[in-house]
A protein has these predicted regions:
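Surface-exposed amphipathic alpha-helices with a cationic face
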Residues: 52-59, 112, 135-140
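Short, acidic loop-to-helix structural element flanking the phosphoryl-transfer center
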Residues: 39-67, 73-77
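Conserved H-loop
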Residues: 86-90, 118, 164
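A metal-dependent, Asp-based hydrolase signature
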Residues: 7-39, 49-57
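A short, structured active-site edge motif that brings together acidic residues
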Residues: 86-101, 124
Length: 180
């Protein structure tokens, strides 16, 4: 539970903020973290029950699905492959290992570019996220924001960050899509 605040924002930013590290120390902490994460930590996670069905149904409805993550894209793709989620995604965008594109707004901008979403089509886009950085990044891109509380958000965090909608379970998310 002490590490929940590290989930969502760029890790370098979190290391510097919570441990008062300077730039060099922050990069060293990030390097050490990635040494363990690339082989072990990367798969210390799982898929919420119901997500496979939800994604499958959304694809059957003809919806485009993108993953926009602050996690390095190379790791995001490995995780999606491991849990057999990659076929559901039209676009996967993450940060670069060299530190480029770590801001969530930039990640979402790139996902929208790859999806070929024109400015006039952004009202058709919904960003789903479980941390305030997701809501802020979506706001920078002028897309609707749905916050999920079955992730890592603290109570009230998503609304304070501008979520247009919130749900507490995968079932509620499924119901949201049935209604929209």
């Amino acid at each position: 539970e002490d590490l929940v605040d590290f989930i969502g924002p760029p890790l370098l930013e979190s290391f510097q903020k919570y441990y008062q590290l300077d730039d060099a120390q922050g990069h060293m902490a990030l390097k050490k973290y990635r040494e363990r994460f690339k082989d072990i930590g990367i798969f210390e996670n799982g898929v919420y029950p119901g997500i496979h069905t939800l994604l499958s149904d959304l694809k059957k409805q003809g919806r485009s699905i993108a993953l926009a993550t602050s996690k390095p894209e190379v790791y995001a793709r490995r995780i999606l492959d491991k849990y057999e989620l990659m076929p559901y995604f039209d676009v996967v965008v993450g940060s670069e290992m060299d530190g480029r594109r770590t801001d969530k707004g930039e990640v979402i901008t790139e996902a929208l570019r790859q999806l070929q979403v024109a400015d006039g089509q952004r009202q058709e886009v919904l960003m789903i996220g479980d941390r305030l950085h997701d809501m802020i990044g979506a706001g920078k891109n002028h897309v609707d924001k749905l916050g999920v509380y079955y992730g890592y958000a603290h109570e009230g965090e998503l609304e304070e960050a501008g979520a247009d909608y919130t749900v507490c379970t995968v079932e509620e998310l499924y119901d949201f899509f049935k209604a929209h």
